[in-house]
């Protein structure tokens, strides 16, 4: 979990380094995402992971195929107009819930570990290279 914490911190440090008026500026992602949209995207997947972990803990989880593109579009549509302070708070709360749910599991679970990794450190690492570039582009 050291990677999860380190990458989470880097992601937020990069976003925090942006001037407030640039956090919502489109261009981070080709489809017009901003850094705020990225934080909302990450937070939404962390929230989804928290739900899955609760289902694993209660024995109601059933693995199923996920349409990632559809979920990404749904998350973006639902969070795009939310103010950045609320987006940030949602992401932090979702991460805390996910980690708390993971730690409350009575026994280890490969499926839980997979969700933690995919929603957390692997997901952060997927987005960090472009975020680093975007921060540099906006800083010029």
Language model feature labels by segment:
Residues 25-70, 103-140:
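Short, contiguous alpha-helical
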Residues 1-8, 84-91, 117-120, 124:
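Hydrophobic packing residues in well-ordered alpha-helices of helical domains and bundles
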Residues 7-8, 22-25, 67-72, 98:
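Short hydrophobic/aromatic-rich motifs at helix boundaries and adjacent loops
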Residues 71-111:
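Acidic/histidine-rich alpha-helical segments that form the ligand environment
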Residues 1-3, 31, 76-80:
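Short, charged, low-complexity loops and linkers
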Residues 1-22, 44-54:
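Alpha-helical bundle segments that constitute or directly flank the non-heme di-iron/ferroxidase center
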């Amino acid at each position: 979990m050291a990677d999860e914490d380190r990458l989470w911190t880097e992601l937020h440090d990069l976003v925090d380094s942006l001037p407030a008026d640039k956090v919502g500026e489109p261009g981070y992602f080709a489809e017009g995402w901003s850094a705020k949209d990225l934080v909302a995207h990450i937070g939404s997947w962390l929230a989804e992971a928290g739900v899955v972990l609760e289902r694993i803990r209660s024995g109601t989880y059933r693995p199923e195929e996920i349409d990632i593109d559809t979920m990404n579009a749904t998350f973006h549509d639902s969070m795009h107009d939310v103010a950045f302070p609320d987006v940030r708070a949602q992401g932090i709360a979702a991460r805390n819930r996910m980690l708390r749910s993971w730690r409350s599991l009575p026994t280890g679970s490969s499926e839980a570990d997979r969700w933690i990794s995919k929603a957390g450190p692997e997901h952060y690492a997927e987005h960090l290279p472009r975020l680093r570039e975007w921060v540099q582009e906006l800083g010029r």
